[in-house]
């Protein structure tokens, strides 16, 4: 009986250890953090300051809030809600593995409020920025 209890204790300890490792395994790098119900993302641009009429790169890291893997079915875009139009360019997104993505083809052609849209699997996340 004691042997069975010890086995159950070891199993419970292993489950707790594995759960804590899984929960901390996905850490987001510094950047702008955006949350949805099932996903946390961090994104940053290169260069860090977006200038009107200048191309930039966007990098994004995603961490699921569940045990599900991050989908590589993604689409990134931006639009100007007040003007009801988007960019004049289509972005290209390359999955880098491990929930990380590299995206090129960004250019904001006019100043004002832009809204990034990040579609990752079935999750839709948005974040607004003001470009002067």
What is each model feature region?
Residues 25-132:
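Contiguous segments within soluble domain cores/interaction surfaces
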Residues 12-22:
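Bacterial N-terminal signal peptides
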Residues 2-12:
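Bacterial N-terminal signal peptides that target proteins for export
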């Amino acid at each position: 009986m004691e042997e069975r209890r010890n086995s159950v204790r070891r199993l419970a300890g292993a489950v707790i250890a594995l759960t804590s490792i899984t929960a901390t395994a996905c850490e987001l790098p510094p950047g702008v953090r955006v949350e949805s119900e099932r996903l946390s993302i961090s994104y940053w641009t290169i260069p860090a300051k977006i200038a009107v009429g200048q191309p930039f790169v966007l990098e994004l890291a995603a961490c699921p809030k569940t045990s599900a893997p991050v989908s590589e079915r993604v689409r990134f875009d931006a639009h100007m809600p007040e003007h009801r139009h988007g960019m004049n360019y289509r972005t290209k997104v390359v999955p880098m593995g491990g929930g990380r993505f590299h995206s090129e083809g960004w250019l904001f052609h006019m100043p004002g409020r832009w809204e990034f849209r990040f579609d990752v699997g079935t999750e839709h996340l948005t974040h607004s920025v003001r470009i002067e």
